[in-house]
Amino acid sequence: MEEGIPFIRVADINEFGLNEPSIHLDNEIYRDVIRPTKNTILLTKDGSVGIGYYLTEDLNAITSGAILHLRMKNDAVLPQYLTLVLNSIVVKMQAERDAGGSIIQHWKPSEIEEVLIPILSNEQQRTICDLLEKSFKYKNLSINLLDCMKEAVEMVVEYNESVAIDFLKEATK
């Protein structure tokens, strides 16, 4: 089904973002199913365990049961910082230690609750989050510039160099 509500599986999530889901569910049947909301951390618990992604906006999608929706109960830890720590080698090693399953790994919620998280001061967390935000901004900018460059190369081949240069000047304002 090409139309409908996107269904996010573990394979569709990574620490840098969400890939476009290949599976969509019927709007009518799944109308009332809960959707992930802004400031939620998606955390994989089955298959590729321990991948976290922080949502900066509400998501009109349904997630697999293999993905937990984590919400912050207090302000002691910033969600962006927690997501970064969840994706760190420190937590990956804990996940590898805890996860069981001979074919598909399963990380139990009770084990996830016991994960040790290094907690920095709020100021240090904020500094890290600001750097992380800049990193994502520059990553997105580089992707956009790369797309512009690809299009400009096609314009050089199809038309001429001056058309491509004009396009790049306009696109990078």
Regions found by a protein language model. Give the residues of each.
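A generic structural signal for residues embedded in beta-strands
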Residues: 43-44
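Low-complexity, Lys/Gly-biased intrinsically disordered segments
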Residues: 1-14
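Acidic, low-complexity, intrinsically disordered peripheral segments
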Residues: 159-172
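Amphipathic alpha-helical segments
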Residues: 75-83, 92, 111-154, 158
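Short, charged beta-turn/beta-strand-edge "cap" motif at the junction between a beta-strand
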Residues: 47-51
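Sequence-specific dsDNA recognition surfaces
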Residues: 11-38
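Basic, amphipathic alpha-helical recognition segments used for DNA target recognition
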Residues: 57-60, 68-119
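Short, well-ordered loop/turn elements at secondary-structure boundaries
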Residues: 2-3, 35-39, 63
